[in-house]
C-alpha cells in the first residue's frame, strides 16, 4: 500500500476494514439460494445433488452459508428465503400424500375416511410438522455450526415477507414461529438476522393477504428484537420492486441493487470492500468553518476512493481457484464462465465498494 494511504489508517483518519484479508478475499454475498440448490453444488469433497424435500433443502441452505463464509471475511444472506424454500414444498407434499395413500391401501376403511378433503387436510397437517422440523433445524444450525476454521458461526441474514404463493407464506410463518421459540431452552438465537420486507398490497395493511405475517413478525420483534423491517414502498426500493426486483439487505445493512456493470438486483452480489471516514476529526479540524469542513471531506473522500482502487488492483490478482466455492461454484455474479486460473476481476465489478463514515452526531457538535 502507498505510504500516504497507510498513514491515513495508522493515524485513524480512514479505516480500512479487515486488513488481514486485504489481499485474500472479498467481504459479503447475497446468495441466489433457490438457483444454487436446484442445480446442486460442490464444497470441495464431492457433489451435493439438488434436494427434493424441505428438510434437505433447509439443511443445505445452512451449508451454503457456512461454505460461503469460509471463502469470505464478511456475512452472507439468503435474498429470498421463503420463496426459495417453497420450491421444495410440492415434492414434499407429494411424498406425504403417497405415504398416506399407501398406508391406507389394503386397509378396510369406511368410504368417508378416503374422502379427498380429509386426505388433503391430513397431508397439510403432516406437511406443517415437517416444515416446523426443517425450520427448527435452520435456527439450531446457524447458532451452532462453525466456519472460518471454527472461529465463529456464519454471520447469516435471511430476507422474508414477500411470498409469491401460499407455500412461501407457509415457510415464512413457520420459520418465524420457530425463531420465536429460541434455542433448546428458549435462549435468544443470535443468528440469523431476519429482514422482514413490508409492502403495500402484500402485507402492510389489514386488508392485504399476508398482513398476518407482518403482525406475527412485529410480535416476535417485540420479544426477540428480530426481525428488522425493510420498507418496500420507499422510493429507492419501489423503483426496483416495480421492475420485478425484490430488494434485499443483510444484518450489517449491505444494500446492493443498482448495477453499472450488468443486471440489477441483489442476487449473486454483495460488498467487495468497505472503508470508513473518521468524520468527527474532519469536523474538529474545520474549526467551525463549514466551507473548510467540506473541502476536508472532499479530500478524505478522494483518498478513500484511491484506497479502494488500490485494493481492487490487489484483489484482481487472485484466481478463481483462490476462492473455490463462491467463485469456482458460480455463486457470485460475473463468475459464470470463469476457469480455475482466470482472474476474479469480473466479480469485483459486480459488487459495491463502500465509503462510509462514523460519528455524525459528534461531527455536528464539533461544527
Give the location of each predicted region.
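Conserved catalytic cores of very large enzyme subunits
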Residues: 1-350
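Contiguous, well-ordered alpha-helical segments that form the cores/surfaces of helical PPI scaffolds
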Residues: 353-366
Amino acid at each position: 500500500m502507498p505510504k500516504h494511504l497507510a498513514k491515513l489508517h495508522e493515524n485513524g483518519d480512514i479505516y480500512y476494514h479487515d486488513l488481514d484479508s486485504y489481499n485474500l478475499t472479498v467481504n459479503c454475498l447475497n446468495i441466489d439460494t433457490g438457483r444454487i440448490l436446484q442445480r446442486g453444488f460442490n464444497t470441495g469433497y464431492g457433489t451435493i445433488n439438488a434436494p427434493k424435500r424441505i428438510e434437505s433443502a433447509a439443511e443445505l441452505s445452512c451449508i451454503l452459508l457456512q461454505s460461503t463464509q469460509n471463502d469470505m471475511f464478511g456475512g452472507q444472506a439468503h435474498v429470498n428465503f421463503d420463496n426459495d424454500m417453497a420450491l421444495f414444498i410440492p415434492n414434499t407434499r407429494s411424498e406425504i400424500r403417497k405415504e398416506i395413500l399407501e398406508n391406507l391401501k389394503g386397509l378396510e376403511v369406511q368410504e368417508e375416511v378416503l374422502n379427498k378433503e380429509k386426505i388433503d387436510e391430513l397431508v397439510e397437517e403432516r406437511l406443517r410438522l415437517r416444515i416446523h422440523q426443517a425450520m427448527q433445524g435452520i435456527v439450531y444450525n446457524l447458532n451452532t455450526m462453525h466456519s472460518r476454521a471454527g472461529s465463529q458461526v456464519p454471520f447469516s441474514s435471511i430476507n422474508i415477507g414477500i411470498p409469491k404463493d401460499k407455500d412461501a407464506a407457509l415457510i415464512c410463518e413457520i420459520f418465524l414461529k420457530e425463531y420465536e421459540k429460541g434455542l433448546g431452552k428458549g435462549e435468544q438465537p443470535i443468528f440469523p438476522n431476519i429482514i422482514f420486507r413490508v409492502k403495500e398490497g402484500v402485507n402492510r395493511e389489514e386488508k392485504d393477504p399476508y398482513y398476518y405475517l407482518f403482525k406475527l413478525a412485529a410480535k416476535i420483534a417485540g420479544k426477540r428484537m428480530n426481525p428488522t423491517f425493510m420498507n418496500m414502498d420507499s422510493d429507492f426500493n419501489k423503483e426496483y420492486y416495480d421492475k420485478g426486483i425484490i430488494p434485499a439487505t443483510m444484518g450489517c445493512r449491505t444494500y446492493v441493487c443498482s448495477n453499472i456493470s450488468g443486471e440489477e438486483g441483489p442476487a449473486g452480489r454483495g460488498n467487495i470492500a468497505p472503508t470508513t471516514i473518521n468524520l468527527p476529526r474532519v469536523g474538529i479540524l474545520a474549526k467551525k468553518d463549514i466551507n473548510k469542513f467540506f473541502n476536508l471531506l472532499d479530500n478524505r473522500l478522494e483518498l478513500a476512493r484511491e484506497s479502494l482502487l488500490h485494493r481492487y488492483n490487489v484483489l484482481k490478482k487472485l484466481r478463481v481457484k483462490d476462492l473455490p466455492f463462491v467463485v469456482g461454484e458460480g455463486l457470485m455474479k460475473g463468475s459464470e464462465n470463469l476457469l480455475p486460473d482466470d482472474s476474479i476481476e469480473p466479480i469485483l465489478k459486480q459488487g459495491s465498494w463502500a465509503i462510509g463514515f462514523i460519528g455524525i452526531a459528534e461531527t455536528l457538535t464539533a461544527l
